[in-house]
C-alpha cells in the first residue's frame, strides 16, 4: 500500500459519514514528508494537532518475545489544548499510517462532541480511506 501511495504524491482522499447523527467530512492527503488529516463537523479546521512517532524503545524482555514500545509526541498547534485531542491525534495517527507507518501526521479536528464511540467511528472511516486503492 505504501508503494502505491508514494508513487504519485500528493494523494488526496475524502469521504463523509453521519456520526452520532451529525454530518462529518473526512479528508486525508499524503505528502512526501507527512500526512494531513481533516475531520470536521463544522466545515472548518478546528484544533490542529501535530503527531509524530518517536523511535521505538526496546524492552528488556524483547529477547524473550516481547514487542517494541512506540511512544508518540503530540502537540496542539492551534485551538484548545485539551488532553482528549492528544488521544484523538495518536489514534488517528495509527489509523491513517497503519501499524508500521512512521510519517508525521497533522490532524485538523472540529467535532460537536467527543466520546469513545465517536472516536471508533472516526477511526473506522479513516482506515477505510487508507485502504482505498489509488487509480
UniProtKB/Swiss-Prot annotation:
<dbReference type="GO" id="GO:0043248">
    <property type="term" value="P:proteasome assembly"/>
</dbReference>
<dbReference type="InterPro" id="IPR018788">
    <property type="entry name" value="Proteasome_assmbl_chp_3"/>
</dbReference>
<dbReference type="InterPro" id="IPR053720">
    <property type="entry name" value="Psm_Assembly_Chaperone"/>
</dbReference>
<dbReference type="Pfam" id="PF10178">
    <property type="entry name" value="PAC3"/>
</dbReference>
<protein>
    <recommendedName>
        <fullName>Proteasome assembly chaperone 3</fullName>
    </recommendedName>
</protein>
<comment type="function">
    <text>Chaperone protein which promotes assembly of the 20S proteasome. May cooperate with psmg1-psmg2 heterodimers to orchestrate the correct assembly of proteasomes.</text>
</comment>
<comment type="similarity">
    <text>Belongs to the PSMG3 family.</text>
</comment>
<keyword id="KW-0143">Chaperone</keyword>
Amino acid at each position: 500500500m505504501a508503494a502505491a501511495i508514494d508513487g504519485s504524491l500528493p494523494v488526496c482522499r475524502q469521504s463523509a459519514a453521519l456520526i452520532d447523527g451529525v454530518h462529518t467530512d473526512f479528508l486525508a492527503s499524503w505528502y512526501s514528508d507527512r500526512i494531513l488529516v481533516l475531520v470536521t463537523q463544522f466545515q472548518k479546521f478546528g484544533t490542529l494537532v501535530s503527531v509524530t512517532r518517536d523511535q521505538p524503545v526496546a524492552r528488556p524482555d524483547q529477547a524473550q518475545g516481547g514487542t517494541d514500545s512506540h511512544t508518540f509526541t503530540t502537540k496542539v498547534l492551534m485551538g484548545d489544548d485539551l488532553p482528549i485531542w492528544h488521544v484523538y491525534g495518536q489514534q488517528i495517527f495509527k489509523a491513517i499510517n497503519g501499524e508500521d507507518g512512521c510519517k508525521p501526521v497533522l490532524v485538523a479536528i472540529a467535532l460537536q462532541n467527543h466520546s469513545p464511540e465517536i472516536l471508533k467511528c472516526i477511526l473506522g472511516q479513516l482506515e477505510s480511506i487508507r485502504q482505498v486503492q489509488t487509480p
